[in-house]
Amino acid sequence: MKLCNDVITVFNARVDPDEGGNVWAPTVIAGASWYATDASTVDASKGGLVAANKATIRIPVEADTGGKQYTDPVSYANAEDVSGLWTLKGGDIVVRAAVPEISDFGTAVFAEGENHPVNSEGLDGVTRAAVTGAEWTPAKLKAAYADCVTVLGVTDNRRAPNAPHWRITGT
């Protein structure tokens, strides 16, 4: 598939009864395509213009997932160990970057031209405070990365004859 030169990180949500909520498992994928647009709509009930961004992300079957295997969302939810698995479903988070462990976030070094957090010179106090803790959460990811979307829909195009891939729409 042409123009698949982006690195993304997919964060799969999984209910953890011991934690009392979702745990977010990351998968870094090299060789994806990210296309984003900004749009506005007029909504009188919300006081006028409402801005939203929309992203279309394509992940070719041959993209590098770091050795992890794709599985359907039901199998992912029922698996005892998801360390070698990844999936795509509504509500997951996708970031246009190779997201480091949260403990390394403040000191991570980003190569020239690589997608990096909102503040490339170093984290300001607000961003640094927003990403403290042991685990990434959607709020922390959205505070740290400009290109961060919530998955709204997934189309499985793996049976396409010319370019088998998954297509994600998100906002």
Language-model-detected regions and their locations in the chain:
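Short, acidic/charged, Gly/Pro-enriched secondary-structure junctions
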Residues: I8, Y76-C148, L152
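Acidic/glycine-rich C-terminal interaction modules and beta/coil loop segments
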Residues: E135-L141, A146, D156-T171
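N-terminal disorder-to-order initiation segments that are Gly/Lys/Arg-biased
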Residues: M1-A77, R158, P164-T171
